Regions:
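Extended terminal
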Residues: 2-13, 20, 369, 381-385, ...
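Transmembrane beta-strand segments that form the barrel wall of outer-membrane beta-barrel proteins
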Residues: 278-284, 305-312, 384-392, 458-467, ...
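Outer-membrane beta-barrel pore domains and translocons
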Residues: 157, 282, 313-314, 344-346, ...
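Flexible, solvent-exposed coil segments and beta strand-coil junctions
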Residues: 68-70, 74, 115, 171-172, ...
Length: 524
């Protein structure tokens, strides 16, 4: 080989050799650590933070391990104090090399161990602090060109997140569109919890995610579409606290603590405004003692209507069934939609007393032990309501049924109503406990059967009634106008035992007629 050929060959091979040496050098630990030091120093200067990495290990082709990553920035209010934005013990990622040349990413392994994080003032909407024991995922099918991503498996273990929402959020003026579509095969969340604080720490919500599994998900971030084939949440907890409200006995709407949550959901679909979900299983306990043994059913909502199908709810001693369909414009003044509801329930004394925490002890003690049966079947809106069936029965105490219709039921100036009521009372001693001691010595509530027809026209009320008690009977009509305070009554009684209602006045049976008419009298 001539000298010229040697020089030509050398010139040709030199860049190749240099590239190969650099490629090999990048897998040498000293070179890797030197490069990391240079990169972290540059990043620290540009970002105004202290960024450090203890150790890096890159194994051919793209199996990367990083240890001891720390990101620190000055505190936004105390100059001499520093905030740790991130503290990562170890991260490992194994990426296939050749798919990268086709704009595809195949991740055989991505593990993050022992992460501490604090967004400080980096995110205006909220401050997020927390720890993460392990994040592990596999992803085969990330296409950077088509903006699609498949997660074969994702697992989160030991996450503790605390989110404090901000009350002053600057408007987001950036325009960006996210076309990514994500397919999820399997997600596991273990031993984790999330706490959210509303601005000013007025409200606080904490969710414990001890064991959550989700399968077969699809998320279209551009359309805002979210689908999941199934979600199972076991050993869950939810705590809700209004921090400025006192704690009350019994069921307290301002301080709710749910535990032992087991939730199973199928066929979840959300793409605003459409929502559909099948509740396969739901059970939980509340700190007041209320136990939800089972809840099943289906909920479907779109831009115009909410439909609750075959809702079945049970506690250990109570149950409820419901079928409800509500047009979302049912409250509109002009051209309102319709609401249809068919509800039946059997409510035990144990469950009712849990909701009566502030009722007198005597009332709760004397409430009958039998379950309270409730039925309601109605349809209508704020212009017109038809009640085809309404019933409440407490065996041994009372049974009340009603049916009728009303125009403008929520407007006392325009309301027009026509209802038929049928009530039978038995032992209502527990009701007497709500009266003062003086009235308890004077008033009695005997077993009575009453039938009434009630008509309302604005604030004018007409009632015709038929009351039977013991051997006596009373028929009558009454009228009252709340605007004018005018009233009238016509009563026809036969052997009506007044002493059964008014004690200690030596009254007896009354037979006769009475007529009353006036205006502005104070009945009390």
């Amino acid at each position: 080989m001539s000298k010229t050929q040697k020089w030509a060959t050398g010139i040709f091979l030199a860049p190749i050799i240099i590239i190969l040496l650099l490629a090999v050098a990048i897998y040498l630990p000293p070179i890797q650590n030197w490069a990391v030091q240079k990169v972290t120093a540059y990043a620290s200067e540009k970002m105004g933070m202290e960024i450090s990495v203890d150790h890096v290990c890159l194994v051919f082709p793209l199996d990367l391990g990083v240890d001891g990553v720390k990101i620190i920035q000055p505190n936004d209010s105390i100059p001499q104090k520093k905030d740790t934005i991130a503290d990562l013990k170890r991260a490992v990622v194994d990426v296939r090399l050749f798919p990268l040349f086709a704009k595809r990413v195949e991740i055989d392994r991505l593990d993050i161990y022992d992460l501490k994080m604090n967004t400080a003032n980096l995110v205006h909407e909220a401050r997020v602090k927390g720890t993460l024991a392990l994040l592990s995922l596999e992803s085969h099918g990330i296409d950077l060109g088509k903006e699609t991503l498949r997660l074969d498996m994702a697992m989160i273990d030991g996450a503790r997140l605390n989110v404090a929402l901000s009350d002053t959020v600057p408007p987001d003026t950036t325009e960006s569109k996210n076309f990514w579509k994500i397919n999820l095969d399997k997600l596991d969340v273990r031993n984790s919890d999330v706490t959210v604080h509303m601005p000013g720490d007025t409200l606080q919500v904490k969710a414990v995610l001890a064991d959550v599994k989700a399968k077969q998900g699809f998320f279209d971030l551009y359309k805002g579409q979210y689908d999941l084939a199934s979600i199972d949440w076991k050993k869950g907890e939810i705590k809700y606290d209004n921090n400025f409200q006192p704690r009350l006995k019994g069921l307290d709407a301002n301080h709710i603590a749910l535990s032992d949550i087991h939730l199973g959901i199928d066929s979840l679909h959300f793409c605003s405004p459409d929502l559909s979900v099948v509740i396969r299983q739901c059970k939980m306990k509340e700190k007041s003692g209320i136990v939800l043994a089972s809840l099943t059913g289906k909920a479907v909502m779109d831009s115009t209507r909410l439909h609750l199908h075959h809702i079945a709810m049970k506690t250990p001693t109570s149950d409820l069934q419901a079928e409800v369909a509500i047009d979302l414009n049912v409250m509109d003044e002009k051209n309102p939609g319709q609401m249809n509801a068919d509800i039946s329930a059997s409510l035990s004394k144990e469950d009712l007393l849990l909701a009566m925490g502030d009722m007198p002890v005597a009332f709760r003690r004397q409430w009958p032990a039998h379950p309270l049966a409730v039925k309601a079947k109605m349809k209508g809106n704020m212009r017109h309501v038809d009640v085809s069936e309404a019933m409440m029965e407490l065996p041994g105490a009372m049974k009340i049924t009603a049916k009728g219709k009303a125009d403008y039921p929520a407007d006392m100036e325009k309301i027009k109503a026509d209802f038929h009521l049928d009530a039978t009372t038995y032992n209502l001693a527990f009701v007497s406990t709500l009266l003062s001691s003086d009235l308890q010595r004077m008033i009695a509530i005997p077993s009575t059967h009453a039938v009434a027809d009630l008509k309302m026209d604005g604030k004018a009320v007409n009632v015709s009634f038929d009351v039977a008690e013991s051997r006596g009977k009373m028929l009558g009509k009454a009228y009252y106008n709340a605007d004018t305070e005018a009233y009238s009554a016509n009563i026809d009684a036969k052997n009506f035992q007044i002493q059964h209602y008014v004690k200690g006045m030596n009254l007896g049976g009354f037979t006769g007629k009475a007529e009353l008419k006036g205006k502005g009298t104070d009945f009390f």
